[in-house]
Amino acid sequence: MHNNFYQEDELLNNELSNRGFLLTKVDDVIGWARSNSLWPMTFGLACCAVEMMQAAASRYDMDRFGMLFRPSPRQSDLMIVAGTLTNKMAPALRKVYDQMAEPKWVLSMGSCANGGGYYHFSYSVVRGCDRIVPVDVYVPGCPPTAEALIYGLMQLQKKIKRTTGFKYDARKNH
């Protein structure tokens, strides 16, 4: 019974695709759109920010992946935390994160943002930005290269395609 159903479904898909129709799930379309139109907001705190700027320049060109840097957290859906996060800067990081619209993602760039890095034992350094905001992707290195950042962004795109779903809560909109 099950095999017969899947064979009929496959025949229908083939017949419709031959006529120029595309069959997919809404979740797949939303995942594709979200992953290919990330708008990062920079949170450059130290030398990793220079590599982040290089990744956006003409040699690597993050625009080809659909990424456009935005100056405001309200227009962004991705925060790239690049560099050493101090205890004084941690509340500002959280405030900016809270201002971002849903769905939102965070990429931690460099050893300092990932775990404190060279300054791990300093009294004034947060030992990883994941103590302040939830992190989706970690990019290692001191500082990580522009290629490493782009690879991390591509991994985030894969994660978004895998995990995204269309969620609508009618109670929130009334």
From Swiss-Prot:
Which is a GO BP term held by this UniProt record?
A: electron transport coupled proton transport
Q: What class of enzyme is it?
A: translocase
What HAMAP family does the annotation carry?
NDH1_NuoB
Q: What GO molecular function terms would the record report?
A: 4 iron, 4 sulfur cluster binding; iron ion binding; NADH dehydrogenase (ubiquinone) activity; NADH:ubiquinone reductase (non-electrogenic) activity; quinone binding
How this chain sits in the membrane, per its record, is: Peripheral membrane protein
Task: Name the keywords, alphabetized.
Answer: 4Fe-4S, Cell inner membrane, Cell membrane, Iron, Iron-sulfur, Membrane, Metal-binding, NAD, Quinone, Translocase, Transport, Ubiquinone
Q: Which family does it belong to?
A: Belongs to the complex I 20 kDa subunit family.
A single GO cellular-component term on record: respiratory chain complex I
Q: Where does [4Fe-4S] cluster bind?
A: C47, C48, C112, C142
Catalyzed reactions: a quinone + NADH + 5 H(+)(in) = a quinol + NAD(+) + 4 H(+)(out)
Which NCBIfam families does the UniProt record give? Answer: nuoB_fam, PRK06411.1
Please give the name of this protein: NADH-quinone oxidoreductase subunit B
Q: Which Gene3D superfamilies match?
A: 3.40.50.12280
Supply the source organism's classification: Bacteria, Pseudomonadati, Pseudomonadota, Alphaproteobacteria, Rickettsiales
InterPro entries of this UniProt entry?
Answer: NADH_UbQ_OxRdtase-like_20kDa, NADH_UQ_OxRdtase_20Kd_su
Name the EC number(s): 7.1.1.-
Q: Where in the cell is it found?
A: Cell inner membrane
